[in-house]
Every structure is written in structure tokens, then in C-alpha cells.
């Protein structure tokens, strides 16, 4: 779902952050120019680019829930951003997150870093509607939310992580939290 936009930009789709919703919203509004490269590519030649980040707790919970719901799919190729962690399987969300952190403790900050290095604007999953409207104002798009105001696309319901798992995420990958807080906002 990585694509160029009308107005000389590019959307860089970080998995499990709300990118499918962004794609469908912009497509419905005629802002998608053309897909490019890999579905989740982070390199581009456009004037500017944007991506969406998700709070690290939410990102890990969403990824683990999606993997469980898909039957632990290993659908990624070697170039996919999740290739390093997609093989993890565990019957609980907490167990899967802990297994990922034990093998790849800084995975999320490394993945976020690749996309942040190429992005001028950063939206947050938790404030996505407001952020996409702010971006629209900055880059001169005319976006109508229509049915998109309520709900998401491709959203996997997930539970809360345990306090123990949250502490483990904070200890293993503090840079992911720094990136989430300090990335340039819209």
C-alpha cells in the first residue's frame, strides 16, 4: 500500500499502524497517484513523504492479534518489514510479544527508523483522523471523510498487554517510545 500521492508526495506504509485506512481514504478522495515498489517500501523520490506511527504497546498488541487471527501466517517475503519476526507463534498475545522481544529486542525502533528517515510528516494512529486532516490542509488536498470518520479498515480486535509485557517492551526498546513521542508531527 505504499504509493505516490497527488501533490508530489508519497505514503510510506508501516505495517499495523492504520495504513490500510489511509490508503482507502485517499483512494476514495482521488489522492492516490500510483503504487510503487514494495507494499511497505520506505524509499521514495517524491518531494515529501508521510507515514503513520502507532504507540509501541498498541503496535505489538495489534501485530500479535493479527498473527493469531490469520493462523500465524508467514506471508512475508524477505523484503517485508516484518520478515524478521513473522515466524513467532504463541497461543497468547503476551507470549508472542515476549518471544519477539527475546529474539529481536529492538525490532520496532529499527523498523520505525527506516520509515522515519524518509518521512517529512508523521501521523499517529491514535489521532489519525485529526492528523490526516491536518496533513490535508498542509499539502493542499481536499479530503472528505464520509464513512471513514467512524471505524477503521482491516482492524484486528486485540486485548490489552499485561503490565509485565509492557515493562519488557519499555526495557527492551526504549527508542521506539522516543521515536513515537519525538517524530515530527503534522
Where are these regions (language model features)?
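Membrane-interface amphipathic segments in extracytoplasmic regions
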Residues: 1-186
Amino acid at each position: 500500500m505504499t504509493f505516490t500521492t497527488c501533490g508530489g508526495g508519497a505514503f510510506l506504509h508501516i505495517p499495523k499502524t492504520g495504513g490500510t485506512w489511509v490508503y482507502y481514504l485517499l483512494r476514495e478522495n482521488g489522492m492516490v497517484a500510483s503504487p510503487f515498489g514494495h507494499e511497505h517500501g520506505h524509499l521514495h523520490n517524491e518531494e515529501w513523504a508521510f507515514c503513520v506511527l502507532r504507540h509501541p504497546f498498541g503496535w505489538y498488541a495489534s501485530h500479535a492479534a493479527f498473527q493469531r487471527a490469520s493462523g500465524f501466517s508467514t506471508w512475508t517475503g524477505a523484503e517485508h518489514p516484518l520478515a524478521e519476526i513473522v515466524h513467532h507463534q504463541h497461543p497468547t498475545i503476551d507470549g508472542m510479544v515476549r518471544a519477539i522481544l527475546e529474539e529481536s529486542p529492538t525490532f520496532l525502533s529499527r523498523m520505525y527508523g527506516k520509515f522515519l528517515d524518509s518521512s517529512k510528516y508523521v501521523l499517529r494512529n491514535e489521532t489519525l483522523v485529526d492528523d490526516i486532516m491536518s496533513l490535508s490542509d498542509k499539502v493542499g488536498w481536499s479530503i472528505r471523510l464520509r464513512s471513514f470518520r467512524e471505524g477503521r479498515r482491516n482492524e484486528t480486535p486485540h486485548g490489552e498487554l499485561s503490565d509485565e509485557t509492557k515493562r519488557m517492551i519499555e526495557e527492551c526498546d526504549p527508542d521506539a517510545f522516543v521515536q513515537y513521542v519525538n517524530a515530527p508531527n503534522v
